[in-house]
């Protein structure tokens, strides 16, 4: 099954066997997961990257050396489905110290807009390519502004399909609503603040106006619950 999936893709792929503990659907053991990674790497059309969870690497530090990588890169990933851990920056440093890693990926559930700022700090202090994103209703900012702070990639769901993580925008929202391909380090950020602003039409109007005027700016919904 794994080789046929890869061979059917017209585009470069990232192959991931995401555990249930980190938001995926894989419930097999580590040996099964390792076998699937091997199957992907030895297919006739191997992926451009494979995703290896940091917790799997901690249990099997020899894993990366044993994989037949060839030209395939490794994304070392970590996900916290509950919230921001207290050792976020220490974990980022530890992951970046591991040799032969192409990209470090860190994703956690945002408790408020404040967690997005930590994602941006991680990107600004990165020692190698990094993905730092926040999940949930407060995490959209980190996904849209990833290129502003030098993020390696962001993730979106195809229109009409289920998102692979809570809070993912659709590709149409990223490209058309937020003009994602125009965002860079010099992009100015504006937004509408309030409770339940997710359905505000303001981002549509303002971002369309920014694009028409050639203004390097983006307008975002910034949800702030009562009590903050």
What are these regions (language model features)?
Residues 37-39, 122, 181, 207-213:
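Short, flexible, solvent-exposed loop/turn segments with mixed acidic/basic and small polar residues
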Residues 52, 134, 194:
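Small/polar loops that bind or transfer phosphate-bearing groups
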Residues 55-188:
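Catalytic alpha/beta core domains of metabolic enzymes, predominantly
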Residues 186-228:
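An N-terminal-biased, well-structured beta-alpha scaffold segment characteristic
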């Amino acid at each position: 099954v794994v080789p046929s999936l890869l061979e059917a893709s017209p585009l470069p792929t990232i192959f991931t066997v995401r555990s249930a503990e980190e938001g995926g659907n894989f419930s097999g053991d580590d040996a099964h997961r390792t076998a699937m990674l091997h199957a992907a790497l030895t297919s006739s059309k191997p992926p451009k990257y494979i995703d290896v969870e940091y917790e799997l690497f901690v249990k099997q530090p020899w894993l990366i050396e044993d994989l037949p990588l060839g030209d395939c890169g490794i994304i070392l990933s970590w996900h916290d489905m509950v919230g921001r851990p207290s050792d976020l920056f220490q974990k980022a440093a530890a992951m970046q110290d591991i040799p032969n890693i192409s990209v470090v990926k860190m994703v956690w559930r945002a408790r408020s807009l404040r967690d997005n700022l930590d994602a941006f700090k991680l990107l600004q202090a990165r020692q190698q390519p990094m993905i730092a994103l926040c999940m949930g209703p407060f995490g959209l900012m980190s996904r849209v502004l990833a290129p502003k702070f030098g993020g390696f990639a962001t993730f979106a769901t195809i229109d009409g399909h289920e998102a692979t993580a809570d809070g993912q925008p659709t590709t149409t929202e990223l490209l058309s609503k937020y003009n994602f391909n125009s965002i860079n380090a010099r992009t100015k950020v504006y937004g509408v603040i309030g409770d339940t602003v997710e359905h505000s039409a303001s981002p549509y109007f303002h971002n369309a106006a920014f694009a028409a005027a050639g203004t390097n700016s983006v307008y975002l919904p910034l949800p702030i619950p009562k009590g903050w």
